[in-house]
């Protein structure tokens, strides 16, 4: 029986100090990257993981529907965001790696990666939306704080 080669890279698993995360709606701000670099020196473990989400918009019968998956252009855009953030972090002399995760539940995935990699901090941009739009789209920072409140991981929200 032939084994098929996976079409994706294996998820990094080594411990890191900081997870720089985005829910995939916007690129990382320079303030957020600078905050992640500053917090890395406070962490007992060195390194920064850059993580962004390519959102799956729905399922049919428990299977991702091809028309609701992120397009190649969206995935490439998210990859470029991650690469630019990694370049900026590496210019500061800090080890960094990154990944683009495809999921329906961005907050759950970010929390899972932070816990698996034993991070001390998760740094996210604050939500720009106000009022009803914020209620509908959600606030990644407050949702992450709620999800990670019983862990040792501190969520840092950088205001926009």
Report each predicted region and the residues it spans.
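Intrinsically disordered or low-complexity boundary/linker segments at protein termini
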Residues: 1-32, 142-160
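Structural beta-alpha unit
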Residues: 1-8, 90-122, 160
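Small/aliphatic-rich secondary-structure junction motif
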Residues: 10-67
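General small-molecule cofactor/ligand-binding pocket signal
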Residues: 49-51, 97-101, 154-158
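A short acidic, glycine-rich active-site loop
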Residues: 67-80
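A structural motif corresponding to the C-terminal end of an alpha-helix
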Residues: 82-98, 148-152
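Glycine-rich, Arg-bearing micro-motifs that act as flexible, cationic patches
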Residues: 124-147
């Amino acid at each position: 029986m032939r084994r098929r080669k996976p079409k994706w890279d294996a998820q990094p698993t080594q411990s890191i100090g900081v997870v720089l995360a985005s829910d995939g709606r916007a690129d990382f701000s320079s303030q957020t990257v600078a905050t992640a670099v500053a917090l890395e020196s406070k962490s007992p473990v060195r390194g920064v993981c850059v993580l962004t989400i390519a959102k799956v918009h729905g399922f049919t019968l428990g299977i991702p529907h091809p028309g609701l998956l992120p397009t190649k252009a969206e995935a490439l855009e998210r990859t470029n965001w991650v690469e630019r953030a990694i370049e900026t972090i590496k210019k500061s002399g800090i080890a960094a790696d990154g990944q683009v995760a495809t999921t329906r539940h961005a907050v759950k995935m970010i929390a899972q990666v932070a816990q698996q990699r034993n991070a001390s901090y998760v740094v996210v941009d604050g939500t720009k939306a106000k009022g009803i739009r914020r209620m509908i789209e959600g606030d990644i920072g407050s949702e992450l704080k709620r999800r990670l409140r019983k862990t040792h991981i501190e969520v840092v929200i950088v205001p926009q």
